[in-house]
Amino acid sequence: MKRPDYRTLQALDAVIRERGFERAAQKLCITQSAVSQRIKQLENMFGQPLLVRTVPPRPTEQGQKLLALLRQVELLEEEWLGDEQTGSTPLLLSLAVNADSLATWLLPALAPVLADSPIRLNLQVEDETRTQERLRRGEVVGAVSIQHQALPSCLVDKLGALDYLFVASKPFAERYFPNGVTRSSLLKAPAVAFDHLDDMHQAFLQQNFDLPPGSVPCHIVNSSEAFVQLARQGTTCCMIPHLQIEKELESGELINLTPGLLQRRMLYWHRFAPESRMMRKVTDALLEYGHKVLRQD
């Protein structure tokens, strides 16, 4: 069995994290040539490329597996050193999370862990359909995802579901939907998506109104909080988690345009196995809080 030298593997990690050889060399305080040599040593050891030399570079499938291994080793090592050394640097936890979870339940869930444990969070925001890929690539040690199946050498637990409602302000509804929400009226009503790969709005309209993807005008805004603001100010209609707009719905500032219809996204918590003690704390906190505030049926 080939056992990688972790100092050499850190060179591969640095190239991916810093998006190039030059910045990786600066990060590691070595020459660019030395970075290339270390990666070449790894590739010779495993007999295959570990890095696709694009701009920015990206790991091959084998490179992803090695980076995932490095994440696990670093987490266990840092936790052990934390037990042995006083005043050590807080443990870094890189997690991939979707923007809507971050805007609603995730931070309250992590509050007890952050208050009691010496950790530093690196929250990488990604669509819930793609967060698991960051775990697969070894960029993070945990991910909130809609994928229910665990990756090899990983664990998964169900968190619960976010229910999305199709909402807008009352003036917006009066302007664009005077006779109710119909297929023809939707074609004229501005909507919003998180990015070009966000299919939440399009999937809802296709499922319930038989509108093909791309048929509705859509703003692109990379912020869950901005969705709420855009809807409140009467700029767009959009899909927003019910958990995020309970007060606005109760006050009438926002209205549910399609009562009885919703889009449900079941969320799962993925992480490497075996779990360190710190990751077990994170897992327990997420599951306990998620089971309280997210739909479980």
Swiss-Prot record:
SUPFAM superfamilies: Periplasmic binding protein-like II, Winged helix' DNA-binding domain. One of its GO terms (biological process) is regulation of DNA-templated transcription. The keyword Iron-sulfur does not apply. InterPro entries: ArgP (IPR017685), ArgP_gammaproteobact (IPR023490), LTTR (IPR050176), LysR_subst-bd (IPR005119), Tscrpt_reg_HTH_LysR (IPR000847), WH-like_DNA-bd_sf (IPR036388), WH_DNA-bd_sf (IPR036390). Gene3D superfamilies: 3.40.190.290, Winged helix-like DNA-binding domain superfamily/Winged helix DNA-binding domain (1.10.10.10). The keyword Transcription regulation applies. Keywords: DNA-binding, Transcription, Transcription regulation. Residues 4-60 form the HTH lysR-type domain. Belongs to the LysR transcriptional regulatory family. Controls the transcription of genes involved in arginine and lysine metabolism. This is HTH-type transcriptional regulator ArgP. It comes from Salmonella typhimurium (strain LT2 / SGSC1412 / ATCC 700720). The gene is argP.
